[in-house]
Regions:
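ABC transporter nucleotide-binding domains
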Residues: 3, 10-149
Length: 149
C-alpha cells in the first residue's frame, strides 16, 4: 500500500496542527511517526484514514484521494485509534463478523477465526467486549483494524 502526502495543513481556528507536511511511503515500507505531544501525529493519522479532513493539501492511498474516494480508502486502511470505539454489548466474534460484513470480507467465518487466533483472543471470543480487560479490548480493536487486509 503506497501513501502520498502532499503539503497537508490542518487548522483549528488559527492554530496550525500540521503545516505543509509532505512525504511518500512505498508499498511494503514500515514507518512510524515520532514527535512530542501536540506535534500532530494523531491528527495526520486521522486524515490519512479519512476520519478528519485536511484544511489544505492532498493525500493519496494506493492512488485513491482520501477526500474524493474516502469509502474506497477506508476499505484498504485499517486504523486503531487511541480510544478504541467498540460495541461493549456485542460478543467478540459477533463484533468481528459485523466489521467483516461492513468490509465485505470473503470467507468471513475463516477470517474471523484467523483474527481471533493471531490476536490471542481464542479464550475470550465468546465473551461480551464489555467484560474484557483493556488489553483484550485493544486486541479486539487490532483484529477489526486488520480483518479486511
Amino acid at each position: 500500500m503506497s501513501i502520498e502526502v502532499n503539503k497537508i495543513t490542518k487548522l483549528y481556528g488559527e492554530q496550525k496542527a500540521l503545516n505543509e507536511v509532505s512525504f511518500s511511503i512505498k508499498s511494503g515500507e514500515i514507518v512510524g511517526f515520532l514527535g512530542p505531544n501536540g506535534a500532530g501525529k494523531s491528527t495526520l493519522m486521522k486524515i490519512i484514514s479519512c476520519y478528519l479532513p485536511p484544511s489544505i493539501g492532498t493525500i493519496k492511498v494506493c492512488g485513491l484521494d482520501v477526500m474524493e474516494q474516502s469509502m474506497e480508502v477506508r476499505k484498504k486502511v485499517g486504523y486503531l485509534p487511541e480510544h478504541n470505539p467498540l460495541y461493549l454489548d456485542m460478543y467478540v466474534k459477533e463484533y468481528l463478523e459485523f466489521v467483516g460484513r461492513f468490509y465485505d470480507v470473503k470467507k468471513l467465518n475463516d477470517r474471523v477465526k484467523e483474527m481471533v487466533e493471531i490476536t490471542g483472543l481464542t479464550i475470550e471470543q465468546n465473551k461480551k467486549i464489555g467484560q474484557l480487560s483493556k488489553g483484550y479490548r485493544q486486541r479486539v480493536g487490532l483484529a477489526q483494524a486488520i480483518i479486511h487486509d
